[in-house]
Regions:
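Short-chain dehydrogenase/reductase
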Residues: 4-16, 47-54, 77-78, 108
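Conserved sequence/active-site signature of Rossmann-fold short-chain dehydrogenase/reductase
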Residues: 31, 38-40, 84
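Active-site beta-alpha turn of Rossmann-fold NAD(P)-dependent dehydrogenases/reductases
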Residues: 5, 34-36, 104
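Conserved active-site helix of classical SDR/Rossmann-fold NAD(P)-dependent CH-OH oxidoreductases
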Residues: 13-20, 24, 54-57, 86, ...
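C-terminal substrate-binding subdomain of Rossmann-fold SDR/epimerase-dehydratase oxidoreductases
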Residues: 60-189
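Catalytic helix-loop patch of NAD(P)-dependent Rossmann-fold dehydrogenases
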Residues: 1-32, 44
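Short beta-strand->alpha-helix junction loop in the catalytic core
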Residues: 40-42, 136
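Active-site loop/turn elements of alpha/beta-hydrolase fold enzymes
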Residues: 35-38, 71
């Protein structure tokens, strides 16, 4: 993580360094959790990485296919919000301090695979469209190794991506009014 070339990564390293410095200077106990690409009910539309699922589902809701920026080979580690909650509990119960853990599944999912999965789950027959991706894209591949979290705080992600996406789609379908309000609020910003 220390060979990044963007401000996003630099801020993450800075935050971790500050927490470590506080621990060693003032005795502040902490555990840092590095969440991979979190998804789930009530998902935020503003996040640079997490919004990809919601944007694809919005396109499908409009009767369009998902749009991928780039060739679809960019890959991420999608982890459910329920698994993130479990990681928080594991970290609070653990004896660990002054440590950082990846919260993810360790599973690599390309944007093309994600789009295909969403098309299958929604029974949408529209094709995926591809557009040029900006070279300013912050991260092109982000898959976390979950082994340290498993070994030291007892956390293992439990939710399969396909199952989690099914739950997310059901939530969207059950609460269309709230979804519309979130979309409108995001558009106003």
């Amino acid at each position: 993580p220390f060979n990044n070339k963007n401000f996003y990564g630099a801020t993450k390293i800075c935050g971790e360094s500050m927490a470590t410095a506080f621990h060693h200077r003032y005795g502040l106990d902490f555990v840092g959790l590095r969440y991979m690409n979190v998804y789930g009910a009530r998902q935020d539309y503003q996040g640079a990485y997490i919004a990809v699922i919601m944007k694809m589902l919005d396109a499908i809701d409009r009767g369009e296919g998902p749009t991928i920026l780039g060739d679809g080979s960019e890959a991420f580690d999608f982890v459910s919000v329920e698994d993130c909650a479990l990681a928080n509990i594991c970290a609070m119960k653990a004896k660990a301090t002054d440590e950082f853990y990846n919260v993810g599944t360790g599973t690599r999912t390309t944007l093309k695979e994600l789009a295909e999965m969403l098309l299958e789950l929604t029974e949408c027959t529209q094709p995926i469209s591809y557009r040029d991706r900006s070279e300013a894209t912050l991260v092109k591949n982000r898959i976390g190794c979950p082994e340290k979290a498993k070994r030291e705080i007892g956390f293992t992600a439990k939710e399969d991506l396909k199952f989690g996406l099914t739950k997310l789609i059901e939530w969207r379908n059950d609460d269309k009014d709230a979804l519309l309000r979130r979309q409108q609020k995001a558009a106003e910003r």
